[in-house]
Amino acid sequence: MNSIHSEYKQRNLKIWNEVAPRYHKRWTSVNKGPFQSTKKLIELVKINKNYHVLDVACGTGAVTKYIQKKLGKSGYVLGIDTSTIAIKIAKKWNEKNKNLDFVNIDAENFAFSKKFDVVTCQYALFFFPNAQKALKNMKNSLKKSGLIGISVHGSKDNVPFFSSILDSATKYIPDYVPPGTPNLDRFGTKSALKTEVRKAGFSNIIIKEFIFNYNPGKFEDYWNNYIKYIAKPLKEKFNALEYSKRSEFKNAVKEKTLQYTKKMVI
């Protein structure tokens, strides 16, 4: 791993450890916005009650918990993630549930002697600097007849909830996205995702596209939630802007959201 990717991973881990509690509170217990994909993902991999499942980059356990509900007494699901805080939350959230475990593991550096029937990975592949390494680890963890289910965001232009702020943020805060950060948009098309997965040795690949609508409320709700939930390093960069620039930034975001907020969908 080159040094710039190593720095990115360390920085990203620190951020996830900070935001995990807020992220969990806001998203993982609801079936709204992007998390409508959880149900779709599990439906597509067709979990059998006796399956052993690996959930890669499980975060605070949203997908893992959903999988566990599909399993019988002989089934088992293991959630893995690099964030110690996310894993701690996942364990607490699932402390009464049986036949599941959570372990601190880097998706780019793991191997299991035992093979799984299904591997899932929701909204994480694009965060891995070496996505190929992570995918090959997942493939090596599968039984020969096993299935992998992956969810990724579409291209940011098709995800206005993110692009409305990100496009303006990178204009007003030039280092908003630090050096070494992988292109989070790189698997946002069917062809790009299929090419990457095939390169890792997978076959019989099926890509499905879904649209999940989300109503963030009025613009002030959308904006205030952005300020409330962003990580400390980004908030510090925002607060370092002159007041006039912060106002310009906010107005630029508002302008971008008009076409969506009028429809109450973003």
Predicted regions and their residues:
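Conserved class I S-adenosyl-L-methionine
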Residues: 2-51, 62-66, 86-89, 93, 149-175, ...
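Conserved donor sugar-nucleotide recognition element shared by glycan-biosynthetic enzymes
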Residues: 12, 30, 34-38, 83-86, ...
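Class I SAM-dependent methyltransferase SAM/SAH-binding core
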Residues: 52-110, 133
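A short acidic, Gly/Pro-enriched loop at the edge of an enzyme's catalytic core
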Residues: 108-119
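A short SAM/SAH-binding and catalytic strip from SAM-dependent methyltransferases
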Residues: 117-131, 154
